[in-house]
C-alpha cells in the first residue's frame, strides 16, 4: 500500500481524519520532530536547504532581468530616466475589453504592460548596465548559478559529501567563513565592480568583458596603492556639474568622502559608496581572522564567555561584566537560539534599509520616482516586522526545547528569566502610559476641531528630536549646536571630511531630516506605543514559554498547546504560540501606522503641500479624512461609469484585499463546535444525495483545531491587509505622479 502523506510522521500518516493533512503541512518544516531524525541529519538537511534557498533567489532575480530585457524599455528609460516610466513586463491576457487594453498600453509600449515600482531600473543603471544585452547576460549567469546551487544542495545530502556534526559545530571556523569569506570578500568584490565598471560607466567610459582587463579605473594605476600614497585616489572627484553617464564634468577619483548627493541624480556619490564598501571589506576580513582556527592563535569564544576576568581589573561579576559561563554550549547546540539572534539582527537591518533607501537614496534618479520610493519603504518595513516577530518566536522555541537551567545557572540568561516579572511589568506600564497619553491627546484634539475651536488643541513641539536634527546640521530651527553652529569644532571637521553634507541636509528638496512638528510628535508616540506593546507581548510570550505563575509546567506541553478547559484556571491563550499569534496583529497594525505616517508626510513634501500634513495630522479625523479617504479616491475611480484607467488593476486588488482580510475573521471569531456541527451536516447531506454520494473521501472531515483555525485566520488577515495597503499606496502615489 502506498504510504500516505506525511512520510515524515507515521503517527500522523495513520490518522483517520483530515487532521492528517493539516498537521502534515504545519509540521513539514519542523525537522526536529520528524521520525528517525538525528542531530547530524538535522544539520545536514538545513545546510542543504540553504542552497535551495539561494537557487530560488537567483532564479527570481534572473527572471526580473530576463523579463525587463525581453519586454521592458531599459534602453529607452536610460535616455530619459525622469520622464520615461520603467516597464516591468508585458501583460499577456488583458481582460475586460478594448478599453482596458488601451489603458494598460502605456509608457511608450505597443501592447499592455505593467510599470515597475521596484527600483531595479535605477539599480541596474547605477551599477553600470547600459543595454538589454547586459541584462540578458546577467540573467543567464544567474540561471547557471541557480543550477549550480541546486546541484550543491543535492550533493551535500549525499553520504560522501555531507559534512559531519563536528564541522557544523566549529564556531570559530564558521565565523571565519561568514565574516571574512562571505561578508568581507563579497564587499571587496562589490568595491571592485563599482571601481572597475560602475564608476567608469557613470563617466561615459564603457567597460565590458572585451576591455575590462585593459581599462584602468584610475590614471595613476596601482602606483599610489603600493607607495602608501592613498590620498591620490580621492583627488579630483566628479564636479557638481557632472552629467551622469557622460564625461561632462567628470573627475578621476575612485574612493571619496564627499557626503551629500550628486546634484543631477540626487543619489549618493558612487565614489563615496565604493569607499564605504572597501572600508566594510577591510573591517570584516580582519574580524573574520580574530578567532582561533587552524593555527592556535586568536580568540576562543568558549574561553572568552567562560572567563572570570573582569572588563577592568580582576572582578568577575558586576554591573558591566555579567557572567556568561555556559553560554557557548547553549548557543552552539541550539539552532533555535542561533536563528533567533540571526533574525533579530536581520530584522533591524531590514528596517534600517527601509529608512536609508529614502533618506540617502543610493540609486541614480530613484529619489524622483515617488511610487518606487513609497513601495520600497513599505515593502522593507513589513518584511522587517515579520522577521522580528520570528526572532522572538524562535527565542521562545529555544527556551521550550533547548534551554537547560543547570547549564546556565547564574549567567545572563538565567538572570533575565529570574527577573522576568520586572521586565514584563516595566514594558506594561510603558505601553499603558504611551497608550493613554497619546490617545488622550489625539481625542482631545479631535473634540476641539469638531467643536470649531482648533486653537485649543494641545500641540507639542518635538524639541528633543529637533535638537538632534540641529546637531546633525539642520539650520532651520536656529538652535546653533554642533554642525548647525558654524563656529563649532564639529563644523570645522565636517567641512573637511564631509564637505557636501550640510548643503544636503538643508536643501529642502530631498528626504533627509524632514522638518518635524506637533503632528510628527503625536504619530511618533503612537508608533512607540505599537512597538512597546508588540515587544511586551513577544517578551512575555518568550519568558513565560517554560512556565508561569498560573501554569508552572509548560515545558512538556511544547511551544503550541491549545485550550485545556477550565482545569488549572484554563490554559487558553497562555502558550508561547498564542503570544506570537497576538503579537502578529500588533506588529501589522504598528507598521500600518509607520507606513501611513511615512507616506502622508512624503506626499505632502512631494506635492509641496506641507500645511496639509501639519494641520490635519494632529487629530484622528484628519488622518481618516485627509489621508485615507482623500487618497483612496483615485483608487476607487480605477473603474467608474465613464470607463477605466490604468489604476483599475489596483482598484480590483484593493477590493479583493478587503475581501481576503474580512474572510480572516470567519476563522478568528469562531468556535470548533460550530464548524464540527456544520461539517457533520454537510457530510450527512452529501452521503444522501444521488450522484454526489458516488464520491467518497478516505479521511473523516473534522473541524480545524483551535491553533489551525487561528493560523488560517491570521494568514487571511495578514495577506488581505498587505494586499489592500499595497494597492492603496501604489495607486494613490502613481495616480498623482504618473
From Swiss-Prot:
Membrane topology, as annotated: Multi-pass membrane protein
Residue ranges crossing the lipid bilayer per the database entry: 46-69, 135-158, 175-199, 273-291, 335-358, 374-400, 422-444, 521-539, 579-600, 647-669, 711-731
Reactions performed catalytically: reduced [plastocyanin] + hnu + oxidized [2Fe-2S]-[ferredoxin] = oxidized [plastocyanin] + reduced [2Fe-2S]-[ferredoxin]
Subcellular location: Cellular thylakoid membrane
Binding site for phylloquinone: 675
Binding site for chlorophyll a B1: 658
Keyword set, alphabetical order: 4Fe-4S, Chlorophyll, Chromophore, Electron transport, Iron, Iron-sulfur, Magnesium, Membrane, Metal-binding, Oxidoreductase, Photosynthesis, Photosystem I, Thylakoid, Transmembrane, Transmembrane helix, Transport
Pfam families tied to this protein: PsaA_PsaB
Protein residues bound to [4Fe-4S] cluster: 563, 572
GO MF annotations, alphabetized: 4 iron, 4 sulfur cluster binding; chlorophyll binding; electron transfer activity; magnesium ion binding; oxidoreductase activity
Classification via InterPro entries: PSI_PsaA/B (IPR001280), PSI_PsaA/B_CS (IPR020586), PSI_PsaA/B_sf (IPR036408), PSI_PsaB (IPR006244)
This protein's record includes keyword Magnesium: yes
Entry EC no(s): 1.97.1.12
Keyword Signal among record annotations: no
Reported function: PsaA and PsaB bind P700, the primary electron donor of photosystem I (PSI), as well as the electron acceptors A0, A1 and FX. PSI is a plastocyanin/cytochrome c6-ferredoxin oxidoreductase, converting photonic excitation into a charge separation, which transfers an electron from the donor P700 chlorophyll pair to the spectroscopically characterized acceptors A0, A1, FX, FA and FB in turn. Oxidized P700 is reduced on the lumenal side of the thylakoid membrane by plastocyanin or cytochrome c6.
Record-stated family: Belongs to the PsaA/PsaB family.
Subunit structure: The PsaA/B heterodimer binds the P700 chlorophyll special pair and subsequent electron acceptors. PSI consists of a core antenna complex that captures photons, and an electron transfer chain that converts photonic excitation into a charge separation. The cyanobacterial PSI reaction center is composed of one copy each of PsaA,B,C,D,E,F,I,J,K,L,M and X, and forms trimeric complexes.
UniProt name for this protein: Photosystem I P700 chlorophyll a apoprotein A2
Organism: Trichodesmium erythraeum (strain IMS101)
Gene: psaB
Amino acid at each position: 500500500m502506498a504510504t500516505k502523506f506525511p512520510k515524515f510522521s507515521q503517527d500522523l500518516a495513520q490518522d483517520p481524519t483530515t487532521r492528517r493533512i493539516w498537521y502534515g503541512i504545519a509540521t513539514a518544516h519542523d525537522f526536529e520532530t520528524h521520525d528517525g531524525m538525528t542531530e547530524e541529519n538535522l544539520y545536514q538537511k538545513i545546510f542543504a536547504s540553504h542552497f535551495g534557498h539561494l537557487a530560488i533567489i537567483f532564479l527570481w532575480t534572473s527572471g526580473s532581468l530576463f523579463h525587463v530585457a525581453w519586454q521592458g524599455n531599459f534602453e529607452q528609460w536610460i535616455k530619459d530616466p525622469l520622464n520615461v516610466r520603467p516597464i516591468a513586463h508585458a501583460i499577456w491576457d488583458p481582460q475586460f475589453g478594448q478599453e482596458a487594453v488601451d489603458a494598460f498600453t502605456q509608457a511608450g509600449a505597443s501592447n499592455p504592460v505593467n510599470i515597475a515600482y521596484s527600483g531595479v531600473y535605477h539599480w541596474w543603471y547605477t551599477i553600470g548596465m547600459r543595454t538589454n544585452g547586459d541584462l540578458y547576460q546577467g540573467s543567464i549567469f544567474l540561471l547557471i548559478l541557480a543550477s549550480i546551487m541546486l546541484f550543491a544542495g543535492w550533493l551535500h545530502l549525499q553520504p560522501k559529501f555531507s559534512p559531519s556534526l563536528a564541522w557544523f559545530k566549529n564556531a570559530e571556523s564558521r565565523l571565519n567563513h561568514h565574516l571574512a569569506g562571505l561578508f568581507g570578500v563579497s564587499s571587496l568584490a562589490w568595491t571592485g565592480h563599482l571601481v572597475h565598471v560602475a564608476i567608469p560607466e557613470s563617466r561615459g567610459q564603457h567597460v565590458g568583458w572585451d576591455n575590462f582587463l585593459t581599462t584602468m579605473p584610475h590614471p595613476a594605476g596601482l602606483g599610489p596603492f603600493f607607495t602608501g600614497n592613498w590620498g591620490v585616489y580621492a583627488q579630483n572627484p566628479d564636479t557638481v556639474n557632472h552629467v551622469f553617464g557622460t564625461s561632462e564634468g567628470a573627475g578621476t577619483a575612485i574612493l571619496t568622502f564627499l557626503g551629500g548627493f550628486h546634484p543631477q541624480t540626487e543619489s549618493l556619490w558612487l565614489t563615496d559608496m565604493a569607499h564605504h564598501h572597501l572600508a566594510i571589506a577591510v573591517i570584516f576580513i580582519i574580524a573574520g581572522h580574530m578567532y582561533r582556527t587552524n593555527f592556535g592563535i586568536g580568540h576562543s569564544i568558549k574561553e572568552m564567555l567562560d572567563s572570570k576576568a573582569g572588563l577592568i581589573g580582576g572582578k568577575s561579576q558586576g554591573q558591566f561584566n555579567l557572567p556568561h559561563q555556559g553560554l557557548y554550549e547553549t548557543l552552539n547546540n541550539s539552532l533555535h537560539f542561533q536563528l533567533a539572534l540571526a533574525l533579530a539582527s536581520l530584522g533591524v537591518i531590514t528596517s534600517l534599509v527601509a529608512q536609508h533607501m529614502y533618506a540617502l537614496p543610493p540609486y541614480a534618479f530613484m529619489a524622483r520616482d515617488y511610487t518606487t520610493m513609497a513601495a520600497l519603504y513599505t515593502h522593507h518595513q513589513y518584511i522587517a516586522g515579520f522577521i522580528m516577530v520570528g526572532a522572538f518566536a524562535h527565542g521562545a522555541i529555544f527556551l521550550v526545547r533547548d534551554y537547560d537551567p543547570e547549564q546556565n545557572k547564574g549567567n545572563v540568561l538565567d538572570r533575565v528569566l529570574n527577573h522576568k516579572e520586572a521586565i514584563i511589568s516595566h514594558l506594561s506600564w510603558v505601553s499603558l502610559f504611551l497608550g493613554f497619553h497619546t490617545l488622550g491627546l489625539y481625542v482631545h484634539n479631535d473634540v476641539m476641531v469638531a467643536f470649531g475651536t482648533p486653537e485649543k488643541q494641545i500641540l507639542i513641539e518635538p524639541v528633543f528630536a529637533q535638537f538632534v536634527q540641529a546637531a546633525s546640521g539642520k539650520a532651520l530651527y536656529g538652535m546653533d549646536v554642533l554642525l548647525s553652529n558654524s563656529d563649532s569644532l564639529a563644523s570645522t571637521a565636517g567641512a573637511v571630511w564631509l564637505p557636501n553634507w550640510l548643503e544636503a541636509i538643508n536643501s529642502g528638496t530631498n528626504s533627509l531630516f524632514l522638518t518635524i512638528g506637533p503632528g510628527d510628535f503625536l504619530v511618533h508616540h503612537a508608533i512607540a506605543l505599537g512597538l512597546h506593546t508588540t515587544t511586551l507581548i513577544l517578551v512575555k510570550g518568550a519568558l513565560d514559554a517554560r512556565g508561569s505563575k498560573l501554569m508552572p509546567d509548560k515545558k512538556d506541553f511544547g511551544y503550541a498547546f491549545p485550550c485545556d478547559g477550565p482545569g488549572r484556571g484554563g490554559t487558553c491563550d497562555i502558550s508561547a504560540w498564542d503570544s506570537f499569534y497576538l503579537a502578529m496583529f500588533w506588529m501589522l497594525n504598528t507598521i500600518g501606522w509607520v507606513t501611513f505616517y511615512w507616506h502622508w508626510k512624503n506626499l505632502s513634501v512631494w506635492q509641496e503641500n506641507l500645511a496639509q500634513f501639519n494641520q490635519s495630522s494632529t487629530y484622528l479625523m484628519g488622518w481618516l479624512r485627509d489621508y485615507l479617504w482623500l487618497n483612496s479616491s483615485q483608487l476607487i475611480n480605477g473603474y467608474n461609469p465613464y470607463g477605466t484607467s490604468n489604476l483599475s488593476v489596483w482598484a480590483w486588488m484593493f477590493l479583493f484585499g478587503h475581501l481576503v482580510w474580512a474572510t480572516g475573521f470567519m476563522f478568528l471569531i469562531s468556535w470548533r463546535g460550530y464548524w464540527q456541527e456544520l461539517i457533520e451536516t454537510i457530510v450527512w447531506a452529501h452521503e444522501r444525495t444521488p450522484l454526489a454520494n458516488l464520491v467518497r473521501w478516505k479521511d473523516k472531515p473534522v473541524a480545524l483545531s483551535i491553533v489551525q483555525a487561528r493560523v488560517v485566520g491570521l494568514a487571511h488577515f495578514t495577506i488581505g491587509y498587505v494586499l489592500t495597503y499595497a494597492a492603496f499606496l501604489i495607486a494613490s502615489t502613481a495616480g498623482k505622479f504618473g
